[in-house]
Every structure is written in C-alpha cells, then in structure tokens.
Amino acid sequence: MADLAKIVEDLSSLTVLEAAELSKMLEEKWGVSAAAPVAVAAAGGAAAPAAAAEEKTEFDVVLADAGAQKINVIKEVRAITGLGLKEAKDLVEGAPKPVKEGVAKDEAEKIKAQLEGAGAKVELK
C-alpha cells in the first residue's frame, strides 16, 4: 500500500505538461487511445443490428450540416458535449459527425432541438 501512496504523491507533483506527456507514454505503452470509449460505443451500436426489430432505446445525434450560423452551432456543441472551443469548431466544420452517441430518445430529441434552434441540420440514428 505504501507504494500506491508514493505513486499518488509523485503524480500529484507533476506539472500539466508532464502529466500530458505521461498520458501519451501510457497510451503508447498500453496500446490505447483517449478516444477509445467513443470508438467502443460506436462499435457496440454497430454490432447490434439484430436488436433493430425492437424499438430503439439508444440514439446517435449526428450533426449533418452546421448551416449558416456556425458560431451559434459551435456554442451549442460546446454546451452539449463539454468540448473545448477548438474541438467543438473542428467537429462542426467536419460535419457530418456524431455529436453524442448512445443517448436515450428523450435526450437525443432535446439535443436535436437545441442544435436545430442554433441553425444546424441534425439526424438521429
């Protein structure tokens, strides 16, 4: 247990740049990526066509087109996803792209309404 406490203490003393470098090194060492949970969710949704006969309970909210009011759409994407400005801008400019995946029908409809209110074209899949 003393080893774990020392590791926690060592990690707590890292600067932000050192922590980012550690993260990259661990991703390379373990062969994983910070984006892995999104990929897993997408793979899980694609692996379930047999359940398509039942009513869908999880939806992917896909930004089809940002429309003319990109700034408003970027603001909404940031509010919905918690992404930073650059990440939200890249998502909006790279449309069509999923904004949120595997969400309940009610939440998906709410997100769709928010984005459409900002001027975007949105699809639920």
Curated annotation (Swiss-Prot):
UniProt-recorded name of the protein: Large ribosomal subunit protein bL12
GO CC term (a single one): cytosolic large ribosomal subunit
Top-rank taxon: Bacteria
Coiled coil: none
MF terms in GO: mRNA binding; structural constituent of ribosome
The entry's keywords: Ribonucleoprotein, Ribosomal protein
UniProt keyword annotation of Membrane present: no
Gene3D superfamilies noted in UniProt: 3.30.1390.10, Single helix bin
Keyword Ion transport applies: no
NCBIfam families given in the database record: L12 (TIGR00855)
One GO process term, biological-process aspect: translation
PANTHER family found in the cross-reference section: 39S RIBOSOMAL PROTEIN L12, LARGE RIBOSOMAL SUBUNIT PROTEIN BL12M
Protein purpose: Forms part of the ribosomal stalk which helps the ribosome interact with GTP-bound translation factors. Is thus essential for accurate translation.
Family in the record: Belongs to the bacterial ribosomal protein bL12 family.
Subunit structure: Homodimer. Part of the ribosomal stalk of the 50S ribosomal subunit. Forms a multimeric L10(L12)X complex, where L10 forms an elongated spine to which 2 to 4 L12 dimers bind in a sequential fashion. Binds GTP-bound translation factors.
